[in-house]
């Protein structure tokens, strides 16, 4: 796969570093574009903040989708506090503040350069999450391929697009996307809040554009804390249609911005107006001040 300009097709065993090198349009970049082209431009030239949630999500993805690569990509830092002693053989009150502790950590980090270092608690949490996924939704990941990269040219705009699919089950013709979440009971809200409908449609259409039959897009969401609740289901057709309309509008806007090389920010309203939810409970406009005061006095 050419890092800078990959040809349309489906790629397996493509590293994340290789994937992000391409400037092809991808789903995650469409979220800042929906705010404004200026936000898209900034997003495309600046690295995304690597939050604790993102890091743990990557760890869980690796544990569920590519468990054979865990040892190569991650290592657990031992509890060096047990090894730290003073010259008289006693234990210091604060082992982490000692020179010996810092030297042990520095040596360990040097020996494991290139791997992400985890605390024992992080590893145990990942194992618990992965066990929950396997117990409740393991059938989704029994056959297929992980981290499938898809590259295609959008027929309408001509733009090169790309996607990295968590899991593709070729036999059952489905894409599965794994999400970690704080509350799986509210995942329907996340579908709209984080534009997951757009992601589902974008990925389905991308794989189809490469000549593959695919019928369903599943989300499997797992809570990142005990008891690690799991929910999994395919998206309904209406959700896919809504997501398709959303990404089509975004791609058309992106194509126009690239063509003109103009990246405008927000447009301003003619006047600031309260949203409907903020006006609820206010009766001044219809009842007048006297009736409002009378109502509140009676309460």
Model region roles, listed by residue range:
Residues 16, 123, 152, 167-170, ...:
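A residue-identity detector for tryptophan
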Residues 124-147, 175-188, 267-274, 278-281, ...:
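Short, charge-rich amphipathic segments
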Residues 3, 202-299:
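Metal-dependent nuclease catalytic regions and adjoining charged, substrate-binding loops involved
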Residues 1-162, 293-294:
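Metal-dependent nuclease catalytic cores that hydrolyze phosphodiester bonds in DNA/RNA
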Residues 145-245:
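Mg2+/Mn2+-dependent nuclease catalytic core
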């Amino acid at each position: 796969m050419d890092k800078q300009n990959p040809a349309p097709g489906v790629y397996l065993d493509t590293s994340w570093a290789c994937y992000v090198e391409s400037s092809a349009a991808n789903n995650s970049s469409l979220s800042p574009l929906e705010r404004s082209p200026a936000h898209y431009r900034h997003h495309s030239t600046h690295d995304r903040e690597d939050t604790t949630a993102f890091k743990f999500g990557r760890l869980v993805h690796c544990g569920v989708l590519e468990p054979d690569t865990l040892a190569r990509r991650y290592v657990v830092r031992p509890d060096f506090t047990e090894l730290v002693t003073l010259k008289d053989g006693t234990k210091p009150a604060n082992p982490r503040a000692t020179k010996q502790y810092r030297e042990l950590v520095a040596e360990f980090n040097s020996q494991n350069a290139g791997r992400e270092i985890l605390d024992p608690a992080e590893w145990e949490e990942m194992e618990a999450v992965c066990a929950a996924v396997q117990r409740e939704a393991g059938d989704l990941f029994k056959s297929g391929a992980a981290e499938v990269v898809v590259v295609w040219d959008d027929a309408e705009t001509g733009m090169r697009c790309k996607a990295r699919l968590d899991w593709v089950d070729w036999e059952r013709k489905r894409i599965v996307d794994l999400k970690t979440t704080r509350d799986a009971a509210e995942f329907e809200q996340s579908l709209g809040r984080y534009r997951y409908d757009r992601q589902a449609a974008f990925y389905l259409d991308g794989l189809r554009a490469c000549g593959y039959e695919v019928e369903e897009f599943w989300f499997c969401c797992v809570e990142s804390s005990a008891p690690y609740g799991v929910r999994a289901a395919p998206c309904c057709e209406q959700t896919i249609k809504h997501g398709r309309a959303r990404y089509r509008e975004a791609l058309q806007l992106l194509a126009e911005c690239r063509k003109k090389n103009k990246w405008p920010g927000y447009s301003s309203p003619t006047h600031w107006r309260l949203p409907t939810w903020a006006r609820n409970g206010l009766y001044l406009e219809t009842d007048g001040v006297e009736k409002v005061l009378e109502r509140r006095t009676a309460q």
